[in-house]
């Protein structure tokens, strides 16, 4: 299998109304905004989508709405993961995957498995998966880092595992994976702030948070890198340096929801235990948007 998840992938937020119900009209607007402004693929129901705070029926409806808007124009990556291997497999078996192009699956969290445990977890999932898999390594959330050697071992043994969303924060680890990975397996940045150096090192794209609000600018940076124009790409990267930090000061997706609210696209609502970003943070981000001439 080959990886089709390249370029700018956007980890879609889930917009809510003030009564905490899902704002499906805003979701449709947001998806069209991505498609009109350079997104190469979309990732639904992952961390940025506040998935732990959604019911199964809400997840199904979000999937239906997004598929209905996209209509095959870009690939769709859908999250299905957890820290109970058997439960993840059961969810895979009971879900409708029509119109979905791949599955994003996270390293088990809280349990803190060994490297062998991580291998066996993804072995079981790969053998059960109906679609190509993209692994997700984010030790800041899971409590365990999947080492480069483990990632490369998994990729070698299971050809339906086509990539990894790598968010360890370690460029050394990224380089080690890219250097030793099997053919057809690719690295995707899981960190907006490290996307520029990761693509320069051989990553093929990003699953982005900032892309929700600024897909045109962020996709341009990525395309410039693909073309070898690192000087112009670096200028865009440096424009975002402060914004990268502010987006996560009060937790994700609080920052990007504040940006989208300032742009008039959504209400600034999150479900507990997440809360909106602080007023001072929101104002700083609004000032950056103004300087970038984003309305």
Regions found by a protein language model. Give the residues of each.
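Catalytic alpha/beta core domains of metabolic enzymes, predominantly
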Residues: 127-128, 141-248
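A general structural signal for well-ordered alpha-helical segments in protein cores
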Residues: 27, 59, 63, 88, ...
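Active-site beta->alpha loop and helix N-cap motifs at the rims of alpha/beta catalytic domains
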Residues: 2-143, 153
